[in-house]
Amino acid sequence: MGKITAIKKLKRLYRVDLSGFDDEDKIYLSEDTIVHFFLNVDKELDDADLEEIQSYDQFAQGKSLALYYISFKMRTSSEVRKYLSEHEIDNTDQIDEVINILTKNNLINDKAYAENFIEGKISMGSAGPYQIKQKLITKGIDPLIIDQALSNIYDEEKQIDVAYKLAEKTNRTYGQRLTLKQLKDKIIQNLMNKGFTYSISSIALESLELETDEENETQLLYTALEKVAKRYSKNYEGYERKQKVTQALARKGFSYDDISSALRDYTFPE
């Protein structure tokens, strides 16, 4: 049997001095633990008492750390779990208990987190459902919770609206720098990279009602022709050079008819 000989408050914890224990002469406990066990100077403790106190204290400190961590912004249960593990709360059962208590008190709510995250992305107009899902998965949220939240919040109409605005932005950026075909391909690719399906991306693209700017297309073709011709003239000539240039321009999205027309009037560099 041992006892407490002194209790001193430190910056964050209390130092509890002990006597009568072979392996412990002092321990550091949270205020929650001090209050929970009514600890005071001269209180007698046996080995079982000490083990129970230390076990509870790790839980109490874990809860305190978790409350501190979530005080700045919403966190997922997975983020809280990782944070506790990184801060020397190594008992998984106690971490589970902390998570369960905070969840029961609605201080951790993965469903609400997913819903707020999705609504934020929709408001920002920055991502499609697939990209949102992948980001939430990295935060440790159950895919079933994510799918349900997306289904409830991010319907097809909202997806088309966000995709259309992103398509408009791409058009403003690249409209005069690309051919119509290149521009359409660019818009579709950008939208799919943002997490929209091909179907939604195509609807957004069609809604733009893009039209060919003949003057701009011609200028782009001749600019590209100059660059490609200069490159291939270093190693090729005659028919082979013409074929290489034609293929290169076709890969850039120019039609064979337009390429042939341009080449008829073009003089290759010597």
UniProtKB/Swiss-Prot annotation:
Which GO annotations describe the biological process of this protein? regulation of DNA repair
Cross-referenced Gene3D superfamilies, in alphabetical order?
Answer: Winged helix-like DNA-binding domain superfamily/Winged helix DNA-binding domain
Q: Keywords, A to Z?
A: Cytoplasm
- List cellular component terms (GO): cytoplasm
Query: Which residues lie in coiled coils?
Result: none
Q: What is its main location?
A: cytoplasm
Signal peptide start and end residues: none
Q: Where does the protein end up? A: Cytoplasm
Q: Classify the source by domain of life.
A: Bacteria
Q: Name one Pfam family in it.
A: RecX_HTH1
Indicate the family of this protein.
Belongs to the RecX family.
What PANTHER family does UniProt report for this protein, alphabetically? Answer: REGULATORY PROTEIN RECX FAMILY PROTEIN
Q: What does this protein do?
A: Modulates RecA activity.
- The entry's protein name is Regulatory protein RecX
Give the lineage. Bacteria, Bacillati, Bacillota, Bacilli, Lactobacillales
